[in-house]
Amino acid sequence: MSFTAAPTESFDVIVVGGGHAGCEAAITTARLGLNTALFSLNLDRIAWQPCNPAVGGPAKSQLVHEVDALGGVIGRLADATAIQKRTLNASRGPAVWALRAQTDKRLYSRQMLQLLQHTPNLALREAMVTGLEVEGEEEQQRIQGVRTYFGSVYAAQAVVLTAGTFLGGRIWVGHQSMAAGRAGEQAAEGLTETLQGLGFHTDRLKTGTPARVDRRSIALDQLEEQPSDAADRFFSFDPAAWVSGEQMSCHITRTTAETHQLIRDNLHLTAIYGGVIDSKGPRYCPSIEDKIVRFADKESHQIFLEPEGRDTPEIYVQGFSTGLPEPIQLQLLRSLPGLEQAVMLRPAYSVDYDYLPATQLKPSLETKRVSGLFSAGQLNGTTGYEEAAAQGLVAGLNAARLIGEQDPVYFPREGSYIGTMIDDLVSQDLREPYRVLTSRSEYRLILRGDNADRRLTPLGRDLGLIDDRRWQLFEEKLQAMDAEKKRLESTRLKVSDPIAPTVEEETGAPIKGSITLADLLRRPAMHAADLVRHGLADGDLPLPVREGAEIDIKYSGYLQRQQQQIDQVKRQSQRKLPSDLNYTNIGTLSNEAREKLSAIQPTTLGQANRIPGVSQADITALLMWLELQKRQPLAPTTQAR
């Protein structure tokens, strides 16, 4: 191995970046026994929440449950630092139920730092990584370490890049800008150029965050209060992580005609509408300017005022991110009811940054160009702490397996939201920040938050991510659920029982002789909580056990049907494609399909089917070609590597 300078230290794995992806990656590799170093520009801002200090929400909470089911930490920390929790979409079906927690951002960061500091095999270093040490040429390149701004070299067998918005980061307030990854923190230099020099394509994306306002300057008594409604619900499946702390309320205000007119009059002063930058921002988290332009017929938009912690007066003004100049921002804030005397503690800003389009990655999140180099989080074009944490765990896991000469772990899209997200990232040419959504999954009834442990904890155990205590808890939960389902199927409510008339009235259906509690649960108006209320179930049974049993029974027909669909799709979509397949030599493919397939090099037929520009006719042609190759050698149609 040759280095540009003698290595200062050597590690098995180096993680570059101390955000949510980096922390999960570093903890994962360290727990798997690898000597790991996490490099951060600022160790005082570990796992910082620079935008909304919240975890969860639709699809995002499912990701958090999945990460926890695999032994990750984001759910545990969210439970420990939550200052408000709410259940979203509770009136709809379980496929879209979601838990969202407002967290104490400073406490979250401190607890993550403490966790990192007390994790065996894990070292922390504060430095700016500006270069990569790579050996070999072209297709045979392999990572061997990193270089820092001040010239130190650190050796590693695997490197995980989790640079967030810091690569070439530039923050904007109006037309004014400065180099920064986020407000008050320097951008990372050199790494983008290093990646480009290795043959990677990079591009630019944009995100933004709203102003912070002093709570003491807001007339909260004039606004609608939004209290916590889910204090007894948690992200983690481990009861030892459950913390029921004091809950705080959020408040709701709305934009006014004055707000909208101020924005229309000053659109040209933003970096985007003024034509200064053209980076794409997140579709599902638009600035207030975008809302006014896109929904010009809407008279008002809801704005949430969310506390950033128990010991700070800072209020996050959700739904009000803006790229307007600072003086106009204050005018906008004071146009909102209840904020007429608002004191702005921090202005809103947007940030544009370099990212690495994830079609250059394998489903393991290892780069295709450089062996041992992994990428995770916002660097891959995603937005959100939850998306970052999930990718960090996957990248860390597969970095460890690469070093251990084990096969990578690929998460199929039909098995988890983690798999859905990664499949989307590596298969699609995304041009805007990617956010996980329940609508992105074809199998969302199966991929619920409540059953993430049943879907993924056995895998986590096999991979060495779940310890004996967690595994015992998991087995005990399964046994309790099985016993409760059997009880519900065998216990009958008779029409002569005293509670029967009340049950008939509530469900709107008669009881003919008798009915099992399971069939009673299948009635739309009856739920596990109602059984407890009527003395038909044990209220001391853990809530996850009662609700899990209810969902399995109430939706059994739908669940079986969707599982059959998944099994059918699996048989075809998981068919492997040769990694060195030369698509240009398959004459039955369209020109566009050849180009797209050659660029992305999908690992399975299912992944190929989801690449934009690859038609069903192309998939049929590819399938026919694969069948032909069973009787012919592959050599004439593969690339020499």
Curated annotation (Swiss-Prot):
InterPro entries: FAD/NAD-bd_sf (IPR036188), GIDA_C_N (IPR049312), MnmG (IPR004416), MnmG-rel (IPR002218), MnmG-rel_CS (IPR020595), MnmG_C (IPR026904), MnmG_C_subdom (IPR047001), MnmG_C_subdom_sf (IPR044920). HAMAP family: MnmG_GidA (MF_00129). Keywords: Cytoplasm, FAD, Flavoprotein, NAD, tRNA processing. PROSITE patterns: GIDA_1, GIDA_2. It comes from Synechococcus sp. (strain CC9902). Its cofactor is FAD. NAD-binding protein involved in the addition of a carboxymethylaminomethyl (cmnm) group at the wobble position (U34) of certain tRNAs, forming tRNA-cmnm(5)s(2)U34. Belongs to the MnmG family. This is tRNA uridine 5-carboxymethylaminomethyl modification enzyme MnmG. FAD binds at residues 17-22. GO terms for cellular component: cytoplasm. GO terms for molecular function: flavin adenine dinucleotide binding. NAD(+) binds at residues 281-295. It is found in: Cytoplasm. GO terms for biological process: tRNA methylation; tRNA wobble uridine modification. Pfam families: GIDA, GIDA_C_1st, SAM_GIDA_C. Homodimer. Heterotetramer of two MnmE and two MnmG subunits.
